[in-house]
Amino acid sequence: MRRRPRASLPGMAGGELWLVRHGETEWSASGRHTGTTDIELSDAGRRHAQLLRQRLAGTEFARVLTSPLQRARVTCELAGFGDRAEVVADLAEWDYGQDEGLTTPQIREKRPGWTVWAEGPRGGETAAEVGQRADRVIAMATQSARTLAFGHGHLCRVIGARWIGLDAAEGIRLTLSTAAICVLGHDRETPAIVRWNDTSHLD
C-alpha cells in the first residue's frame, strides 16, 4: 500500500468533505459497470435519495457539488440541494470505455482475475487518471469549511483513498453502497476518514 509524504496529502488543506453516492439504478443493482451512460434512478433509487433529505437537513454546507450525470444530479435534487448545486465535470464516474455496461464476471471470462483498479477498462480511464480528477475535486472542496458532493461509486472510493494520501487504486479497499454517506475530515491536522458507507438513513 503506497502512501505519499504527509505534507503532500490532498486533504491537508483543511475543511470537511461529505460524499454521497447516487441512488440505485437498474445497472448498479445488477453489477454492471456504469460510467458515462446517463442512466436514470430506479424507483428504489429515488426513494433512497428522498431519505437523504432528512438525514442531511440538519447539517450546514458552505458548498454543494454534483456530477453532471443525471443519477447523481437527481439524487442531489431529491435530497434537497438541487437549487444550489454546482455541476462539476470531475465528479463524473470512471470512464469504463469498452467495458461499459459489463459486469466483472463477464469481463473475467476473457481476462481472468481482472479488476478495474489494477488492469483498468479497455479504452477507458486508468486509476491514476481518475485519481487526478479526484485530487481536483478535493482541492475545490477544501476551499470551504464543509462541502457536500454527489458522485459515483468508484469515483468516491478514489476520492476517499486520495484524501488520506493513498494511490487511487487503493480505493479497492473502500466498499460503497448506493445512497451512502461518507465524511472525510481530520484527526487534528491529519486527513482522516471520519465516516464511511453510512446507510443508516435507509433502515
Set out the residue ranges of the language-model regions:
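Glycine-rich phosphate-binding loop signature in dinucleotide/nucleotide-binding domains
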Residues: A57-E60, A141-A145
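GST superfamily/GST-like fold recognition
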Residues: G153-R157, D187
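Generic beta-sheet signal
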Residues: L17, S144-H154
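Acidic, low-complexity terminal tails and accessory targeting/binding regions
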Residues: M1-G15, W94-P105, Q143, A161-D203
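Loop-to-helix element that buttresses phosphate recognition and phosphoryl-transfer chemistry
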Residues: G15-T75, R122-D135
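Active-site signature of alpha/beta-hydrolase-fold catalytic machinery across serine-
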Residues: L78, V158, R162
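Phosphate-coordination/substrate-recognition cap region in phosphate-metabolizing enzymes
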Residues: R2-G11, Q50-T115
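Short glycine/proline- and acidic residue-enriched helix-loop micro-motifs
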Residues: E109-E129
